[in-house]
Amino acid sequence: MNWIKLLPVAIAGVVLCGCTSILNEEAILNEEAPASSHSEPSVINDRQIVQQMTSRVTEMMDSDSVVEMKDLIEKLKEEPKAKLQLPEVSQSSADEAQKAVAVVGGVYKCNRCPDWHIAPASGFLIAEDLVVTNYHVVDNPERSGLAVRLFDGRMFMVEDVVASSEQYDLAVLRLPKTGVKPVALGPSAPVGAKVSLISHPNRKFYTLSEGRVARYFVTQRNRKPVPAMAITADFGKGSSGAPVLNEQGQVVGIAASTESLYYTEKEGVQNNLQMVFKNCVPVSQLLELIGG
């Protein structure tokens, strides 16, 4: 099973994680997330989002108020639970749900420039000051901090770990109040139910994919059995922590890992890829973690 951890990669000659020149800040803010209308959807500029995150996180990391990653990981490993009173949220469209999806990423310095960078994964708001992602997104001691970028372009540093479970691969993180409408947590989705997912695979920010619940099964984490959910909607590296949504826009799962099935293996080399399983955390485990 391959956990979706973010590493510097290149596609078609474009370096996806590294130094980039910073565009004019005003131009970035004006172009990164244009206002949508009934006739025109929001247009995502991946390159400008990366550059804006680099610029903003460099400013934030230079302040004295950043909670260091080692402190977040220390709290993470305590595996706190919380009895949370979540706000009542009405049914959400895909466009509304998109605004509650966040980029969640560890902050690091490369060896080619003085700037700070973000290794982006995914997450979503369940309250205006609470974001959910995977445990393994936070558990990276090589990072210096943890940043969150909202759909509207604002960025925050994570202040605290409110709840976490390594076995369930979940973390609930505290932010300053954002004023953003969160997504609702729904009931468990039956096998065959239609689902969608909004995530950031390989820095293709706010990509929507659709599919169905394929099955529920038992997997192993830390040598302990734990229920999991598989879906047919595509996701990949950078999608960890993304919300799996039902047709009412409610969260029914959280993207966690992929597992590739190859037909042959010779001398340790796998060949003839047949299919890829997309494994998720069921929403029931998140509800258990936060006392829902």
Where are these regions (language model features)?
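Bacterial N-terminal signal peptides
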Residues: 8-17
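Active-site region of chymotrypsin-like
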Residues: 98-115, 155, 171-182, 207-292
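Bacterial N-terminal signal peptides that target proteins for export
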Residues: 1-7
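Bacterial signal peptide processing site
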Residues: 20-22
